[in-house]
């Protein structure tokens, strides 16, 4: 009888394992991924005779394998290059315009990191970001690397794909690779990449090169993406690893005290993710690998709910504190939602200290702006809606609450590059939220007495360079003033992923991914009242008469129009000066006779007019389009000024 029972049980087990829809099969499907650890042949450790570079003195790194005694060493340059070693000229960052990367490339969420390149024998900036490689969905299944020498942020090199999960997706990801980050452990000479494999895991991998590549089937540590969404990494000098992320309700509801704090908060956006910070164990294979968890308390209220985009900067010497950036959700005076601002917090104790809202030294008092939601506590450092602008009459940076560029999500980080603090974020292009481009600007980092301050940068076409020559060709897609500007939310699935709120009546920048295409990235759907602006153009130190050449394509209706050219602001009331006008009538276009054809078949025409006023110095330049019709009057691709 006993044998019969055992035989029956064995048959039942075999039957269950063969059935396709069983609980056992489901359990196997939902089990953690079978990652393998990266096994190095050597385990190198930094030696006591090593020392790091300063701004003026080079460094030395010496490593010995703890297992076999094998060793190697190398020297590093000073952190600041006074002259470009390739040209011998003084470093100016000329040419480091926005967007920062080639127009066909779309890398949002970029975290800038400065690492020593042993292959190039120089300090380089590496951008670790998502990849909007299709334009029909957030973030593809690969990460694409770009890097540049710290002394020339116009000299970007594509270093190729450094992680691709499109074939194996061992973590179970079905959407794509969201915002990554990377940190260097000087103690082991290794680079740790934390990736966000959406709807599955945040995965920590290791490599011995800042460009990887990292193997998609390897992991040193991982956690549910619901626990750590949009992860960021910081490695302290002693090698301790810290991971920051946004935590979702399904996880923090397991912590009653956190759930109660969030429930009592006045956060109204419906995005109730909150900031989480983890200290990992020295032995990442020990249990869950987590040594301690902090929930980012701050001095203004119990806990800070944030939706996404944390960037754990870590220790900043100039401020004497740890710094943490996050996406700021706030409401403008017109009731519009903004998540284009990135804000910051600071603490003097990473895991146990109080988190304080940072200061940005900009007066943000504004009528009816007392109902902000998560951000805008005077701590915005980057806003790609253009609401932080230099007043042309005073020269002071101010908060205007007037968007001058399509606003949508933003995400980025800070790096000290050749002695200057550079903040990287992204802007929206195309008619969806899936064609974001890397942008940059220089911020000021300093102590005001004992108060840490990070002063934001003005979102500008000239970016880190400060200005562009008016006498060199400017691509129209470099605009950072494109009005009327509207919200750029995630698209719906209707109409080929074009969101109904991305109105047909507003100009936008076309999004091309073909690096060989001609006249493929431009300002499209201009109408009466459209303004396209560029900050800043340098006309030189001598006052001179100028002429303007523009490359335009008329709208389908062939609408007659003209464009007024303004300096400093697009209206006299705002402090602008009209420089001249250019006729875009059918007769003017026909008289030109100088045309070029784009890859998409669009016929472009060069028009040229002498300006009515002489000009000198550095100015914002604004093109104000006018027509008697409300139909689309055309598109705008390039322009250049000439003297005389």
Where are these regions (language model features)?
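Extracellular modular ligand-binding repeats in secreted and cell-surface proteins
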Residues: 30-83
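Carbohydrate-active catalytic/glycan-binding domains of CAZyme proteins
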Residues: 32, 78-644
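Bacterial N-terminal signal peptides
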Residues: 9-17
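Secreted/processed peptides and extracellular or luminal domains of membrane proteins
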Residues: 20, 71-74, 213
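Positively charged n-region of N-terminal signal peptides that target proteins for export
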Residues: 1-9
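Long, low-complexity, intrinsically disordered N-terminal extensions of eukaryotic proteins, enriched
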Residues: 12, 22-25, 65, 529
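Sec-dependent signal peptide cleavage junction
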Residues: 16-34
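Surface-exposed loop/turn motifs at beta-strand-loop junctions within extracellular Ig-like
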Residues: 18, 67-69, 625-629
């Amino acid at each position: 009888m006993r044998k019969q029972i055992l035989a029956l049980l064995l048959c039942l087990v075999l039957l269950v394992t063969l059935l396709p829809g069983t609980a056992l099969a489901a359990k196997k499907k939902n089990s953690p991924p079978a990652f393998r650890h990266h096994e190095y042949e050597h385990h190198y450790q930094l030696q006591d005779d090593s020392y790091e570079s300063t701004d003026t003195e080079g460094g030395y790194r010496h490593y010995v394998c703890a297992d076999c005694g094998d060793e190697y060493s190398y020297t590093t340059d000073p952190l600041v290059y006074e002259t470009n070693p390739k040209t011998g000229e003084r470093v100016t960052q000329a040419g480091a315009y926005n967007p920062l990367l080639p127009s066909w490339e779309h890398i949002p969420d970029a975290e800038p990191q400065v690492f020593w390149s042993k292959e190039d024998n120089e300090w380089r900036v590496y951008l670790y970001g998502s990849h909007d490689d299709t334009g029909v969905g957030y973030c593809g299944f690969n990460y694409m690397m770009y890097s540049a020498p710290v002394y020339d942020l116009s000299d970007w090199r594509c270093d190729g794909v450094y992680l691709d999960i499109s074939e194996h997706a061992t973590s179970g990801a079905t959407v794509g690779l969201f915002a990554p980050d990377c940190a260097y452990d000087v103690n082991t000479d290794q680079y740790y990449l934390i990736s966000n494999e959406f709807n599955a895991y945040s995965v920590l991998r290791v490599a011995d090169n800042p460009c990887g590549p990292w193997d998609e089937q390897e992991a040193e540590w991982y956690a549910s993406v619901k626990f750590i969404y949009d992860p960021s990494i910081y490695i302290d000098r002693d090698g301790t690893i810290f991971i920051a992320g946004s935590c979702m309700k399904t996880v923090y509801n397991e912590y009653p005290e956190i759930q109660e704090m969030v429930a009592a908060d006045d956060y109204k956006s419906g995005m109730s993710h909150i900031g989480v910070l983890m200290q990992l164990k020295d032995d990442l294979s020990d249990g869950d690998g987590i040594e301690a968890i902090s929930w980012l308390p701050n001095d203004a209220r119990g806990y800070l709910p944030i939706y996404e985009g944390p960037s754990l900067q870590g220790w900043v010497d100039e401020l004497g504190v740890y710094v943490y950036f996050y996406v700021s959700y706030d409401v403008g005076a017109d009731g519009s939602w903004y998540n284009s601002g990135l804000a910051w917090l600071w603490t003097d104790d990473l895991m146990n200290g109080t988190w304080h809202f940072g200061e940005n030294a900009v007066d943000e008092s504004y009528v009816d702006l007392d109902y902000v939601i998560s951000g805008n506590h005077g701590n915005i450092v980057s806003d790609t809606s253009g609401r932080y602008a230099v007043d042309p009459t005073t020269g002071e940076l101010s908060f205007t609450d007037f968007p001058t560029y399509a606003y949508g999500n933003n995400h980025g980080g800070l790096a000290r590059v050749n002695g200057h603090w550079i903040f990287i974020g992204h802007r929206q292009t195309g008619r969806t939220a899936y064609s974001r481009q890397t942008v940059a600007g220089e911020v000021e980092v300093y102590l005001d007495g004992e108060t840490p301050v990070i002063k934001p940068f003005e979102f500008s076409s000239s970016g880190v360079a400060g200005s562009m020559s008016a006498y060199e060709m400017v691509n129209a897609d470099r605009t950072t003033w494109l009005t009327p500007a509207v919200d750029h939310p995630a698209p719906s699935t209707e109409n080929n992923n074009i969101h109904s709120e991305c109105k047909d009546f507003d100009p936008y920048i076309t999004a091309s991914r073909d690096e060989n295409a001609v006249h493929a990235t431009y300002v499209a759907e201009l109408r009466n009242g459209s303004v396209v602006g560029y900050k800043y153009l340098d006309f030189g130190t001598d006052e001179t008469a100028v002429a303007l050449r523009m490359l335009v394509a008329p709208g389908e209706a062939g609408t007659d129009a003209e464009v007024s050219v303004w300096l400093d602001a697009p209206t006299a009331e705002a402090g602008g000066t009209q420089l001249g006008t250019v006729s875009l009538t059918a007769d003017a276009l026909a008289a030109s006779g100088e045309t070029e054809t784009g890859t998409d078949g669009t016929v472009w025409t060069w028009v040229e007019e002498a300006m009515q006023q002489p000009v000198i110095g550095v100015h914002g330049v604004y093109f104000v389009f006018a027509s008697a019709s409300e139909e689309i009057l055309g598109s705008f691709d390039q322009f250049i000024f000439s003297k005389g």
